[in-house]
Design a protein with these regions (language model features):
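N-terminal glycine-rich beta->alpha transition that marks the start or flank
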Residues: 12-15, 21-69
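C-terminal hydrophobic helical "lid"/dimerization subdomain
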Residues: 34, 260-305
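Glycine-rich cofactor phosphate-binding loops and adjacent beta1-alpha1 units
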Residues: 171, 183-249
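Rossmann-fold dehydrogenase core element
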Residues: 229-275
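A glycine-/small-residue-rich N-terminal strand-loop-strand element
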Residues: 69-93
Length: 305
């Protein structure tokens, strides 16, 4: 029987188990995918801990995972455009991709370009959708200056590149270990910590937009820098929407097969990098989350069944 990650109750990393499950069967309009790689995301840890129960409650036993890349193993009735053996990138809304096999809606899949490595493809969907939506939300145009917090993380590392492609000057807030990577991608790196507002002001004469992928006080920082609330997007501080009138457009706002295909095409063309911080086998899912939750990583942590 195939294996999948499950948890029976809310809790820490130790509630995650890899167990045998029945082989999933695709229904009408669905595709069975043999998973080759699946990214893990901070929001999945928060769901497992019960911190997002009011927004996204778990039903036990619960699976995990949204991102996936793999090989089509079968299709349900009515599916066109995909057949057994096709290499695909996709996403599932059913928290089920941290597994050897997953059933996915056909409309949630895009063809994986041949030159894109499995671990990169499997890391792309949630971070890519979120970054895409955030850049779109702040309406960047050539000549704008945007600051991105968490600029070397899974979402931030993609957002800074998409912002550069939009013609913006990009200031990236990150730990000093990641400043070289940011500078190499045309981003002005700025260190966290006391005095960050002054360092940002010295880096650029104005800030027109702000993308917060980190949380904490960064929405307030954006407003302190004079950014209009309509051009601030946070993917973390959801309460700031009501409090300050900022935006909170992320994964759901960007999720589509067409966006996935566009981003995968940029990767294949060498115009977008998805940094991979670490790769773990499915059986080491607990270790994968420990690496994620230590923080200060560049890019994504990925499981390979």
């Amino acid at each position: 029987m195939p294996q999948a990650v499950r948890f029976e109750e809310y809790g820490g990393i130790d509630v995650l188990q890899v167990v045998e499950v029945p082989q999933p069967v695709p229904g009408p309009g669905q595709v069975l995918v043999r998973v080759k790689a699946a990214g893990i995301n901070p929001g999945e840890a928060k769901i497992r801990e019960g911190l997002l129960h009011a927004r996204w409650p778990a039903v036990f036993p619960s699976g995990e995972g949204t991102d996936l890349a793999g090989i089509v193993a079968g299709t349900g009735s009515g599916v066109t455009g995909f057949s057994a053996g096709d290499e695909v990138i996709g996403y599932t809304d059913n928290r089920a991709s941290h597994a050897e096999y997953v059933v996915v809606e056909a409309g949630h899949l895009a063809t994986k370009p041949a030159g894109v490595p499995w671990e990169v493809a499997g890391a792309l969907p949630v971070a890519g959708f979120t970054a895409y939506a955030a850049v779109r939300a702040v309406a960047l145009a050539p000549g704008d200056t945007v600051t991105v917090s968490g600029a070397a993380g899974g979402v931030g590392s993609i957002a800074v590149q998409l912002a550069r492609r939009a013609g913006a000057t990009v200031i990236g807030l990150a730990g000093e270990a990641n400043h070289g990577w940011l500078a190499g991608h045309g981003v002005i790196p700025v260190a966290y910590g006391d005095g960050v507002a002054g360092r940002i002001r010295r880096a650029a004469d104005r800030v027109d937009a702000f993308i917060d992928t980190f949380g904490g006080d960064y929405v307030q920082l954006a407003l302190e820098l004079g950014v209009k609330p309509a051009r601030v997007d946070t993917i973390v501080s959801f309460d700031a929407v009501q409090r300050y009138g900022v935006k909170a457009e992320g994964n759901a706002a960007g999720a589509s097969a067409s966006v996935l295909a566009e981003l995968a095409g940029l990767i294949a063309a060498g115009q977008l990098e998805v940094p991979i911080a670490a790769v773990f086998p499915l059986a080491k899912v607990q270790d994968a989350y420990r690496r994620l939750e230590r923080g200060h990583i560049r890019g994504k942590v990925v499981l390979v069944p």
